[in-house]
Amino acid sequence: MPTAATPTGIELYYETIGSPADPPLLLVMGYGSQLIAWPRGFSELLAASGRFVIVFDNRDSGLSSKLDGAAVDTEAVMAAAGAGDLARARELAPYTLSDLADDCIAVLDALGIDRAHVLGASMGGMIAQQLAIERTERLLSLVSMMSTTGEPEYGRPTPEALEALLSPSPPEREAYIASAGEGLIWASRRYGDRARLEALAAESYDRCFYPEGVDRQLAAMLASGSRADGLRALELPTLVIHGLDDKLIPPDGGERTAELVPGARLMLVEDMGHDRPEPLWPVLVEAILDHTGREEAIPNILRAP
């Protein structure tokens, strides 16, 4: 089982797709999700087009290390962050987005990769942004997908989406699978697929059911604050992809990200929610390949399809 180790002893399970001779593309998954949430066919399309695709489980998810027993009071973290006391919020959180960004570096180091293109989705986009800010020299480019800047006024979920996101996961397998349909709230209105969501939930449950980890990941996001200043100073080719149907992180989160990063390209995708439906893979893959194949970011706004 391939794993990467951090200096603090965290073990990160990873998988690769494609040829190591191709430009490396690290995919960073989001809140409460395992690497299998990256559709295999999506990754294979990228690999078949000449990218060395790397996927991994964030800490506290999947087959990576779990911080068992590291209790966190998410309400206290939220209160501290909401009051502007990020120092207190970080004291209460077991780790932050910076630590999760360091985990990305550990994966690259394990593979002997000096620099990589990095694509992050949702919380993974936040991690990728943090990584780009703190370790710009390790990135070839950044793709921030369905994510936001950490500024509280942007990318705010609808009440219904937030309630569904924070609902406790049922411990019984069948109930857990049935609850996956709540994800239709933020999925593509045109391509939302309950059966697909339930199939992923079944695979995720059987691979690793670990609801304890989501509280610590939530605390990491809350305690990390705004990345606006770092994004303003970022000198890195950046593509921002956001679905116009997204109710979990609405499009203004992506628009704000692109506004802050100098030279960033913004791609607003019709019929895409907080998901990556298969009918949209070709346009998403084409945009990612185009972006990771150029040396300079070209200011532009795309609307697809």
Predicted features by range, described:
Residues T8-A87:
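Conserved HGGG/HGGXW glycine-rich cap/lid loop of the alpha/beta-hydrolase fold
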Residues A175-R216:
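Conserved alpha/beta-hydrolase catalytic His-Asp/Glu region
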Residues L234, V240-H242:
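Short beta-strand/loop motif that positions the catalytic acidic residue
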Residues D245-I249:
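Acidic catalytic loop of the alpha/beta-hydrolase fold
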Residues I133, L142-P171:
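Flexible "cap/lid" loop of the alpha/beta hydrolase fold
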Residues A264-P305:
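Catalytic active-site module of serine/aspartate enzymes centered on a nucleophile-bearing elbow/loop
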Residues V214-G230:
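Active-site nucleophile elbow and catalytic-triad environment of alpha/beta-hydrolase enzymes
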